[in-house]
Amino acid sequence: MHPQGRAAPPQLLLGLFLVLLLLLQLSAPISASENPKVKQKALIRQREVVDLYNGMCLQGPAGVPGRDGSPGANGIPGTPGIPGRDGFKGEKGECLRESFEESWTPNYKQCSWSSLNYGIDLGKIAECTFTKMRSNSALRVLFSGSLRLKCRNACCQRWYFTFNGAECSGPLPIEAIIYLDQGSPELNSTINIHRTSSVEGLCEGIGAGLVDVAIWVGTCSDYPKGDASTGWNSVSRIIIEELPK
């Protein structure tokens, strides 16, 4: 089965029909018996047809599709849309607190003694006054020096810090102890040893301003005192430092 061709356009068919009609009129013989007026009208009609359709071009086949044109200019902005619906409620977040504080400036002090050689068993040994800059800070204190305790029977001695006359309560006292037992009968319990030791700790809850920091010697609870000595033949020092919390 042969494929059918594409149908001719109506304009092409009409033009072919008119040309065919013109050719038939031109080729038809004119009878001698015809009236001259009729012959003249026929010639006039033929000229009119020739004038009307002279130069008429038949429609050719369709051309190749043209290329895409250049993109058009952007259109005007559209009108805003209607507001959307509210979203779902989010989860509860964490609360963050930011503290904007001035930069921390180191604040410390040292008091030292070349040879305290303090032989008391009860009382204040040395004191150092410090200026505390902030109320919400802590004080770090250190005493370094030689300590000694001797006795013939069991004894105990305690060295501790005070702040403006009171021991630290934030959180607990700052102290060090030496306990000496009488030992066995064959040992000499009166041996005299001086050893460099330290008493150190942090204390919180002290207000800003002048603070009298002192090192003391006293007794241990439920034990008798002995023969104490502090700072013999060596340098002793108290170091105080203010620290941020």
UniProtKB/Swiss-Prot annotation:
In this chain, the stretch annotated as Disordered covers 64-87
Q: Which GO terms describe its molecular function?
A: frizzled binding; Wnt-protein binding
Signal peptide region: 1-32
The chain positions of domain Collagen-like read 59-92
Q: How is it modified after translation?
A: N-glycosylated.
Per the UniProt entry, the disulfide pairs are none
Q: What is its main location?
A: secreted
Locations listed in the record:
Secreted, Extracellular space, Extracellular matrix
Question: Function of this protein?
Answer: May act as a negative regulator of collagen matrix deposition.
- Name assigned to this protein: Collagen triple helix repeat-containing protein 1
Source species, please? Mus musculus
